[in-house]
Amino acid sequence: MGTPRAQHPPPPQLLFLILLSCPWIQGLPLKEEEILPEPGSETPTVASEALAELLHGALLRRGPEMGYLPGSDRDPTLATPPAGQTLAVPSLPRATEPGTGPLTTAVTPNGVRGAGPTAPELLTPPPGTTAPPPPSPASPGPPLGPEGGEEETTTTIITTTTVTTTVTSPVLCNNNISEGEGYVESPDLGSPVSRTLGLLDCTYSIHVYPGYGIEIQVQTLNLSQEEELLVLAGGGSPGLAPRLLANSSMLGEGQVLRSPTNRLLLHFQSPRVPRGGGFRIHYQAYLLSCGFPPRPAHGDVSVTDLHPGGTATFHCDSGYQLQGEETLICLNGTRPSWNGETPSCMASCGGTIHNATLGRIVSPEPGGAVGPNLTCRWVIEAAEGRRLHLHFERVSLDEDNDRLMVRSGGSPLSPVIYDSDMDDVPERGLISDAQSLYVELLSETPANPLLLSLRFEAFEEDRCFAPFLAHGNVTTTDPEYRPGALATFSCLPGYALEPPGPPNAIECVDPTEPHWNDTEPACKAMCGGELSEPAGVVLSPDWPQSYSPGQDCVWGVHVQEEKRILLQVEILNVREGDMLTLFDGDGPSARVLAQLRGPQPRRRLLSSGPDLTLQFQAPPGPPNPGLGQGFVLHFKEVPRNDTCPELPPPEWGWRTASHGDLIRGTVLTYQCEPGYELLGSDILTCQWDLSWSAAPPACQKIMTCADPGEIANGHRTASDAGFPVGSHVQYRCLPGYSLEGAAMLTCYSRDTGTPKWSDRVPKCALKYEPCLNPGVPENGYQTLYKHHYQAGESLRFFCYEGFELIGEVTITCVPGHPSQWTSQPPLCKVTQTTDPSRQLEGGNLALAILLPLGLVIVLGSGVYIYYTKLQGKSLFGFSGSHSYSPITVESDFSNPLYEAGDTREYEVSI
């Protein structure tokens, strides 16, 4: 081209003619045209620009399937780039190959195809982008020609440039989302972009602030069998691999899932073929929390808040010390966690307790850090002017290996006031003469478990010490326990005061040297007794300590006449050879309800009447160390009933009863709906004690497929040996065999019914060419006729009766290239010899039948002629004259249908 001339818009008449000719030029290749204006024509401003834009839109309509307007999208779901982003228009050659997105035509002035920053990128900017406004009609435009008043020539060049743009869906495929709440939708599979992309493989990564998790709810889910949607939690951090929460077979509309971390992934795959439906998922962030810290043994924990910033404070029971941090803080993070390990409560082996007021001394457990041998020394010091009272709560020492000594003072040289080798355990306890006590425990590999719990209390010298009653309660008239105060004792259920009977109260006496006028009673679990309360407890002798051998205890439990007794076995751990027998009635002569031995789990028993008898027998003999803890039985009265408790039908299932009323012996049979399996016993029986033989079962949805099995001449690889929903089984054949059928089977769930495999199990067939059917021999036939036979298959031939087979009866297809039969097909020939007994067959048999038949016909015809022609008599023997003349052969009737002498033919078959 030469020197560019000044450009003027084309005259409106020419543009209008070109616009009218668009239907004829539609589909033709675009090319540049020079349009020269008529001399003396004026330069239109706004009207010519509008017509140019109309022309531009008409040129865009290159086919009926691509009806785009300038700067618009055909599919409303394919949004334009976000605001602020620049859509580059590259310089392209005139002939461009089709791209993967919609084609947009841009008009650039001066023939510049998007090159340089001065060229506008699009004639009409897409929504959401910023572009310079069009020039106002009133504002002067830029100079169109050289300065100096030279004659200007206007040339308009329309350049059509094919621009490949990348468009995105509202929620982009492979997109990172950081908002706290929103929606994730599947891309439109019917859009032009999706049709050209082929297989869609999209990953939506949702991440929120640390300390928050992500909760999703499936609002719409309509996927085909070929489409897959995976929900994964985690990922995005080193060492934190994503964990599968669910796949498309496990998801359902309305389902809610929570990610335990601040990141969640949605992985969607879809084939190229557009399908309806898709998915729509709502997501929102929720505040994560630390797990509840475990309670330490012999201690407890109190938590202010489980969310980040909350604290957990640990404390130990009396006699135990905390090992570790007393307070833990919930720290924020991808997964909030406590800032330390959970502490433990340990009994210390010795130590000094200053300013003692109230507390305990507990022996540590042998072994571990302290070793099998113990030497523990405690010093208990009270404040000035106070003394100490030591109460023996629980003591179990090995006579040969354990020793406990208590001294009134604070040194090993203080006077001994108790020695386990010489003294019995003081039920009243010990009182120090000074403000200190020295306690020493020695244990050398004991044969029996070591148990020691001593309760100490400091009290004023002008007052009595506070009485203590293990397994009981103490009420007093003076909480300060000054002289004159009364203390009354009562035991907890299952225990009895010892010594029994009144007085059950003691008094603080002697103002000069205050002391109690009697010893404190004790609450002990007794061996036997009569119990008539509506509810109570039966304990083994000396509970919670182990019972001693040589026990024979009988308890009688009685309630109101119209009631019966429900017995709950909470703890049962008796020695081998010991037995607890329950009698359904008053006395050991009643029917035996149950006999319990050794350790037993928790269970319930029901009497038939208002009386129940319990007998515990432990033969005398040396105790078995480590066993025989005892038992704890709770009882209460319940209404009398002659039926077992009503059991509701299971969810997703039903039950049938053998009787209308749930009386003794009634059998309940449980079944589940299709797609669910029964967890528990399917048959329950109402027992004699009106309790069911087992806990009611439940119906659980089956989430596994049946084992599809192995294949001959091949092997398989399973992603999960249990075949859960979503698992895959890959089949492969041995060398020389080819797979017929689907190579991979997928277990998918169904709304009704059990999970099912996506296809049938394939087969492994030989890779050799099949043998063609050799044909059927004349006068013979084959078994299982088909056109092709695989290598190794056999074909068998048979002949019809009267023919004999010449050749091989069975031929086999031998593998090869090509495969061949082992021999030629046989022939069927007529049998040479005939059995004499069958000589009448064929023509002889026909002659034997037709010859007698012909004789019968001849004789019958002769008799007929004889009677009718020769004798002139009727064959039927009618007699008498008639009132009409016989009709002769020459009748007056002219109708041939009534002509005499008609001929009839009879066909006789035998």
UniProtKB/Swiss-Prot annotation:
Keywords: Cell membrane, Disulfide bond, Endoplasmic reticulum, Glycoprotein, Membrane, Repeat, Signal, Sushi, Transmembrane, Transmembrane helix. SMART domains: CCP (SM00032), CUB (SM00042). Glycans are attached at N176, N222, N247, N332, N355, N373, N473, N517, N641. Residues 123-145 have a biased composition (Pro residues). Residues 866-910 are cytoplasmic. Residues 288-347, 462-525, 642-701, 703-766, 769-830 form the Sushi domain. It holds the Pfam family CUB. One of its GO terms (cellular component) is plasma membrane. Induction: Increased expression in the majority of primary lung cancers and lung-cell lines tested. O-glycosylated with core 1 or possibly core 8 glycans. Residues 1-27 form the signal peptide. It is found in: Cell membrane; Endoplasmic reticulum membrane. The chain crosses the membrane at residues 845-865. Residues 41-48 are annotated as: O-glycosylated at one site. The keyword Signal applies. This is Seizure 6-like protein 2. It comes from Homo sapiens. The gene is SEZ6L2.
